[in-house]
């Protein structure tokens, strides 16, 4: 493995249960977290020790989405619906009852929110008017993860039936079904140039799909010992990271798909349990990770170190 210098910048605590999700905020140094304790917190990478409680919901939260145009944070309230939170005032602006199931992911594109649910539905919402536009039901198994491709106008959704389904962003027609994994798909992620779709899930395989060739399989890598929970690129698109139930974060070269670094507890004071979600910020390219161990870690990754560890 090539040398990548890893430095742990901060260990953030405050949540009282497993931390399931992260979302970027209105500026590069701001981000949000939510957990099994129903708490939504705001953090500043310039002073990561000073968290701020933004909202407290009754049930666990698996999904957050920040809408930049409105300055609102959308929280997926499991077994209920979504809550629109004015983060500046720390007040709820609106809510929408959606489902009795869990809400696993929320993404947005222009005036639309896409919500992945445990019932297998992907619910399309007109967020400025807080109303349901469409319910896409193509599986009885959970819809777990969503990625938006504005170039090809595609919406990729990973399901617990091991398939990735690709929908047209305008018509909501199903345009492709990828028999992708042997078990649940937990993460789908487009490359920043939208030429590749990466996926990972319970089978611990990292899969790469060629978008320009109608999502033909390009590569399959046994990437982790246990389930891959999340995949995210750095802002420039030169590298990406995967995180897993095996407690590790792995750093990859995006062009060669070469594994560059393993970040874990023994070598880097990493997480002690499953790493659930990551956020690669544009604030000094810092990487943020959240875990079942109730902590958030902030990392600096140097790909051009002047000296080796």
Give the predicted meaning of each segment:
Residues 12-19, 55-61, 96-103, 136-143, ...:
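WD40/WD-repeat beta-propeller blade N-cap
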Residues 34-37, 76-79, 116-119, 158-161, ...:
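Conserved strand-to-loop turn within each blade of WD40 beta-propeller repeats
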Residues 40-43, 83-85, 125, 164-167, ...:
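WD40-repeat beta-propellers
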């Amino acid at each position: 493995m090539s040398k990548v210098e890893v430095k742990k910048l901060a260990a953030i605590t405050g949540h009282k249960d497993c931390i399931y999700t992260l979302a970027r905020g209105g500026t590069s140094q701001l981000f949000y977290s939510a957990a099994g304790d129903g708490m939504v917190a705001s953090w500043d990478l310039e002073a990561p020790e000073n968290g701020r409680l933004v909202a407290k919901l009754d049930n666990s939260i698996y999904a957050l989405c920040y809408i930049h145009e409105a300055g609102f944070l959308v929280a997926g309230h499991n077994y209920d619906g979504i809550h629109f939170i004015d983060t500046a005032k720390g007040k709820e602006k609106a809510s929408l009852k959606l489902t009795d199931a869990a809400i696993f992911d929320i993404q947005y594109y222009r005036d639309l929110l896409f919500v992945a649910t445990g019932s297998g539905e992907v619910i399309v919402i007109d967020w400025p008017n807080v109303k349901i536009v469409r319910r896409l039901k193509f599986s009885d198994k959970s819809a777990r993860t969503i990625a938006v491709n504005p170039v090809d106008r595609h919406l990729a959704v990973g399901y617990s039936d091991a398939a990735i389904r690709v929908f047209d962003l305008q018509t909501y027609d199903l345009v492709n079904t990828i028999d992708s994994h042997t078990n649940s798909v937990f993460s789908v992620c487009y490359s920043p140039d939208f030429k590749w779709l990466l996926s990972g899930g319970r089978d611990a395989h990292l899969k790469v799909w060629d978008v320009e060739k109608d999502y033909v399989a390009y590569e399959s890598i046994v990437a982790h010992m246990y389930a891959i929970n999340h995949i995210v690129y750095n802002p420039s698109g030169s590298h990406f990271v995967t995180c897993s139930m095996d407690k590790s974060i792995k750093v990859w070269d995006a062009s060669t798909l070469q594994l560059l670094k393993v970040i874990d507890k023994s070598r880097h004071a990493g997480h002690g349990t499953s790493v659930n979600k990551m956020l690669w910020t544009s604030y000094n390219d810092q990487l943020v990770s959240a875990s079942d161990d109730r902590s958030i870690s902030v990392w600096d990754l140097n790909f051009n170190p002047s000296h080796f560890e």
